[in-house]
From Swiss-Prot:
It comes from Rhizobium etli (strain CIAT 652). Pfam families: Urease_beta. SUPFAM superfamilies: Urease, beta-subunit. Keywords: Cytoplasm, Hydrolase. This is Urease subunit beta.
Length: 101
């Protein structure tokens, strides 16, 4: 073993196993690309994105931590969302929640 070396287990690692999911169609109605990070409260994303915000309340993208999804102008795509975990408190973003979900 080399100091600092990380030896990962063999096989695939399933992310967010067992988390309930919801799939939404999202359209970028704006004239600029919008990028949304893995742990951003999806309901509070850029107003140029058109989707069912009530269905996205308390949820984030089901993608690996530290990654993002980019929506080009005029683009429509499906995204899968999972519930925010932990204390389920949301602060900042667009300041639409500022507390418990």
């Amino acid at each position: 073993m080399i100091p600092g070396e990380i030896i990962a287990a063999s096989g695939d690692i399933e992310l967010n196993a067992g988390a309930p999911t919801v799939t939404l169609e999202v359209s970028n109605t704006g004239d600029r690309p919008v990028q949304v990070g893995s742990h951003y409260h999806f309901a509070e994303t850029n107003a140029g994105l058109s989707f069912d915000r009530a269905a996205a309340h308390g949820k984030r993208l089901d993608i690996p931590s530290g990654t993002a999804v980019r929506f080009e102008p005029g683009q429509t795509r499906s995204v899968t969302l999972i519930p925010l975990a932990g204390k389920r408190e949301v602060y900042g973003f667009r300041q639409l929640v500022m507390g418990k979900l």
